[in-house]
């Protein structure tokens, strides 16, 4: 049952890619498709996110309101549940 669902889903994905490729007149289709899927707005990275998720260590601190996680070594929100 799981195998047939996986094969069906894989077939649908391949059908979508083939249909999209046949309609596309661009020669660098894979690069364009991947760049459109993983495109990110540069303003969103800097202004919205702030320091959340930035790598840190105890010598190199985080922004105001964030602390360096002992476990993962990145900046997380400071709160009463943090030790």
Curated annotation (Swiss-Prot):
Record-annotated membrane-spanning stretches: none
Entry keyword annotation includes Transcription: no
Subcellular location: Secreted
Classification via PROSITE patterns: HWTX_1 (PS60021)
Positions annotated as propeptide: 22-49
Entry keywords, A to Z: Cleavage on pair of basic residues, Disulfide bond, Knottin, Lectin, Secreted, Signal, Toxin
Domain of life of the organism encoding this protein: Eukaryota
Segment forming the signal sequence: 1-21
Tissue note: Expressed by the venom gland.
GO cellular component: extracellular region
Domains as described in the record: The presence of a 'disulfide through disulfide knot' structurally defines this protein as a knottin.
Function: Agglutinates erythrocytes.
Protein name: U5-theraphotoxin-Hs1a 3
Lineage summary: Eukaryota, Metazoa, Ecdysozoa, Arthropoda, Chelicerata
